[in-house]
């Protein structure tokens, strides 16, 4: 059985989020939580919260046991980009892209 959790419009670029997502893919939930707590990346905190939400969904909605779960799939998609301008010399302006991410985690108890 599976349980899912989604996180939308997180203000971290998808490229940086994927680095963290790749470290916990196909790992046991307990190992993934320990990994995320010790990871020195800004993207680790929102992914840890999302993983805890997926585990809570599995336990409360489907009656699964938390210690038997593993991260079946995790993927990061690109959200809408906020476009800003930075003034530069001689009347120019550089465009600044503030990228957002959408993250989906699926946990399962079947290998």
From Swiss-Prot:
Keywords: Ribonucleoprotein, Ribosomal protein, RNA-binding, rRNA-binding. The lineage of its organism: Bacteria, Bacillati, Mycoplasmatota, Mollicutes, Mycoplasmataceae. GO terms for biological process: translation. Belongs to the universal ribosomal protein uL22 family. Pfam families: Ribosomal_L22. This protein binds specifically to 23S rRNA; its binding is stimulated by other ribosomal proteins, e.g. L4, L17, and L20. It is important during the early stages of 50S assembly. It makes multiple contacts with different domains of the 23S rRNA in the assembled 50S subunit and ribosome. It comes from the Bacteria. The keyword tRNA-binding does not apply. HAMAP family: Ribosomal_uL22_B (MF_01331_B). One of its GO terms (cellular component) is cytosolic large ribosomal subunit. This is Large ribosomal subunit protein uL22. It comes from Mycoplasma mycoides subsp. mycoides SC (strain CCUG 32753 / NCTC 10114 / PG1).
């Amino acid at each position: 059985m599976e349980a899912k959790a989604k996180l939308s419009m997180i203000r971290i670029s998808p490229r940086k989020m994927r680095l963290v997502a790749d470290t916990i893919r196909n790992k046991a939930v307990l190992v993934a939580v320990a990994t995320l707590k010790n990871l020195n990346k800004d993207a680790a905190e929102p992914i840890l919260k999302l993983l805890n939400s997926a585990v809570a969904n599995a336990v409360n909605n489907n009656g699964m046991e938390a210690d038997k779960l593993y991260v079946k799939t995790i993927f990061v998609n690109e959200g809408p980009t906020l476009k800003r301008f930075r003034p530069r010399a001689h009347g120019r302006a550089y465009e600044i892209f503030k990228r957002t991410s959408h993250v989906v985690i699926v946990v399962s108890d079947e290998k």
